[in-house]
Amino acid sequence: MRMTMEEMKNEAETTSMVSMPLYAVMYPVFNELERVNLSAAQTLRAAFIKAEKENPGLTQDIIMKILEKKSVEVNFTESLLRMAADDVEEYMIERPEPEFQDLNEKARALKQILSKIPDEINDRVRFLQTIKDIASAIKELLDTVNNVFKKYQYQNRRALEHQKKEFVKYSKSFSDTLKTYFKDGKAINVFISANRLIHQTNLILQTFKTVA
């Protein structure tokens, strides 16, 4: 049975999403290890990247097994959200023009606000302010994306437009999740949706970095 284009896109999105723990959890570990043993850290990083590429979700499985073995009870989705604000070198745009650096900055700002959700969600007043801040950060990021579109011409504009549409789709999904949360109080769904939005934010940077 052949998959439709939409199903293929959804599968690709799910596959890359399960790899989120590689850069959110393991990259900071590799960075710390580099200070002690640069060669070992680089070898380990390369091995994890290769293994994750061939078996998406492997890093998450390894982390979960370690936590299970140590009998550590942790909400992995919440913890992932808390850690996902850090810059990931592989996604950062290196072009020096102000518009591109502004794109890095706006993406960073959105991720940092989203990562604070677990700390704010139980305080209704603070959480409502956080939601407003997220909405503003989303708008600012999209405005910056549009500014780059206006100023620079791309051969692969279709890929950029597609990624922008995906980001908008997940932004709306996040908004819908918030509305549901205020009815059912299930914070875990907000954390999942926020992680997806952070992932889409990283993919915007990655797409611009690839074609720019």
Curated annotation (Swiss-Prot):
The keyword Protease does not apply. Disruption phenotype: Lethal at an early embryonic stage due to defects in angiogenesis, vasculogenesis and hematopoiesis. Mice exhibit low levels of KDR/VEGFR2. Gene3D superfamilies: 1.10.12.70, Nucleotidyltransferases domain 2. It comes from the Eukaryota. It is found in: Cytoplasm; Golgi apparatus membrane; Cell membrane. Its main location: cytoplasm. One of its GO terms (cellular component) is plasma membrane. GO terms for molecular function: protein homodimerization activity. Homodimer. Interacts (via C-terminus) with CCM2. Interacts (via C-terminus) with PXN. Interacts (via N-terminus) with STK25. Interacts (via N-terminus) with STK26. Interacts (via N-terminus) with STK24. Interacts with GOLGA2. Identified in a complex with KRIT1 and CCM2. Interacts with KDR/VEGFR2. Interaction with KDR/VEGFR2 is enhanced by stimulation with VEGFA. Interacts with RIPOR1 (via C-terminus); this interaction is required for the association of RIPOR1 with either STK24 and STK26 kinases and occurs in a Rho-independent manner. This is Programmed cell death protein 10. It comes from Mus musculus.
